[in-house]
Amino acid sequence: MSLPRIALDAMGGDVGVRVMIDGAAEARRRHDRFKFLLVGDETRIKAALDTHPNMRGASEILHCEDVVGGDEKPTQALRRAKTTSMGLTVNAVKQGEAGAAVSAGNTGALMAMSKLALRTMPGIDRPALAGVMPTLEEDDVVMLDLGANTEADARNLVQFAIMGAAYSRILTGREEPRVRLLNIGTEEIKGTDALRDAAAQLQDAAGLAMQFDGFVESDKINRGQVDVVVTDGFSGNIALKAIEGAARFVTDLLRNAFTSSIRSKVGFLVSRPATELLKHHLDPNNHNGAVFLGLNGVVVKSHGSANSVGVANAVAVAASLLENDLTARIASDLAELGERMWDATGGNGNGPAPK
């Protein structure tokens, strides 16, 4: 099965052109169906491509030297959307020159450019940034929003739940993913009005392709008891950074412990297979690729410091969403929900509104 090519912002992120191209080549080694539109400085891209013969005939270069800065405000970046590698990468999806966009650049700028170029889907007020994290079980957990919206009302949270469940079905194959709202407790009286209202709407709605299980606390996110965790972008980003920090802390703690004495070094050699498995499980590069859900197109955000394996995984996420037509799945779920939950006469003109 052929795939639409993937537009890759070769200039975005902290790692440079070579790592981005190495990642694209690694993705193509895994799946030779992948083809790319590489956006960035042609001279630097060609130099990086010289070591990857598998990219010959599978990539086209769109020359661009201008880059969105890591600390650049979204409003400033938008004014340069037609001249920057990030803007041209997203525009390739809008123009049908690519099926998906992947960038490791400034998250706020990428969201702003994507929303302006691709617009939000009917029935969705705000896009959300969704990522996956490891759990104690086989399947990863989807979490959104991870920072696209610092605030979210009940309507937004319900929409996030629908989008997150559609994404989880692609990842896990589970027809009715277990969905919970992130809260400070699991009791019905806990949390903000928005959380309680969203919970009531999800609990009462019929026809949702999910199993809504109420609230979840942050210490249970990675236990394997939930498939989708829904929250506003402010809380979601804090939770994500806390989990990533805890993972690094555990990794560093083990490294220090295993190098503290001769005996501990011997112990490391004995336990190395287990520790390598733990390291692999906690490595963010193995879970790289957050998705802007709710847009009329596929846009994937790679971590700015991702290595070539991480970039390859972000490309794989984009390809999976194209293969499984995530946008159409979300649209179908929203349409199926219909009058059972929304008052079609309300809202802001961008979709139905909650009763």
Swiss-Prot record:
GO cellular component: a single term: cytoplasm
Entry similarity comment: Belongs to the PlsX family.
Subcellular location: Cytoplasm
Annotated source species: Erythrobacter litoralis (strain HTCC2594)
Enzyme class: transferase
Catalytic function, reaction form: a fatty acyl-[ACP] + phosphate = an acyl phosphate + holo-[ACP]
Subunit structure: Homodimer. Probably interacts with PlsY.
Protein name, as recorded: Phosphate acyltransferase
Domain of life the protein comes from: Bacteria
Keyword Transferase carried by entry: yes
